[in-house]
Amino acid sequence: MKVLVLFCLVSLAAAGPLKDALNKAQVDAFYAEGYIVDGSNAADGDAPYQVSLQRTSHFCGGSIIADNYILTAAHCIQGLSASSLTIRYNTLRHNSGGLTVKASRIIGHEKYDSNTIDNDIALIQTASKMSTGTTNAQAIKLPEQGSDPKASSEVLITGWGTLSSGASSLPTKLQKVTVPIVDRKTCNANYGAVGADITDNMFCAGILNVGGKDACQGDSGGPVAANGVLVGAVSWGYGCAQAKYPGVYTRVGNYISWIKGKGVPV
């Protein structure tokens, strides 16, 4: 049986449409751990914008977009208070090294829909400025408003998410994988078979009809980059690394005006 998952969650048994599965997802939220599926260890400087969102331990990823702002997925922070969050950065390890900073404010998208996972984007303001400008701590550039990753172009996904859907152990080091963008129309047709919709605020990436490479639980909110630009945030999928169901990502290019409107200095 395949499973529908938000990539910060424990696996979800799902024989029905996305909406039904996500009702359970909301109960299980924030208890997943994770690795990139079929990735490799990231090296210093590969993803200096990557951060780990933590309460008592890692539960989601995020991206540094300014020295006091993190971009992540709305489903990662739903129901959480800023005071409960710590951000670890400037390290390839989610559980040691680098630096930590507390969150002071959480800004979830006002139109985030937990049934369809549309508008799955959020910002976290840090209580103090992060020390950036080092090999493993740099803000990533944002795309132009309205930009959309081109089909067949490649993106770099990084995170500490699970090796396979439902797995529980975390990798020691940050993982990375490169996958191609899948045409939205094709992806939408495939996901239609399981009652899910790929909106204009999402895009898909993976090796269609082959699978094997993907983000998975624990990677949610983390960066999807193309040529040093943050084009996406890890969002959800039907299982992990399935041949017909590539990973689904928040299309950051549709939210630049929203980000600037929240006072982010980009």
Curated annotation (Swiss-Prot):
Biological process annotations from GO: proteolysis
Record has Methyltransferase as a keyword: no
Gene Ontology, cellular component aspect: extracellular region
Disulfide bridge map: C60-C76, C187-C204, C216-C240
SUPFAM superfamilies recorded: Trypsin-like serine proteases
One Pfam family hit: Trypsin
Peptidase S1 domain residues: 36-260
Protein name, entry field: Trypsin Blo t 3
Source organism of this protein record: Blomia tropicalis (Mite)
Organism ancestry: Eukaryota, Metazoa, Ecdysozoa, Arthropoda, Chelicerata
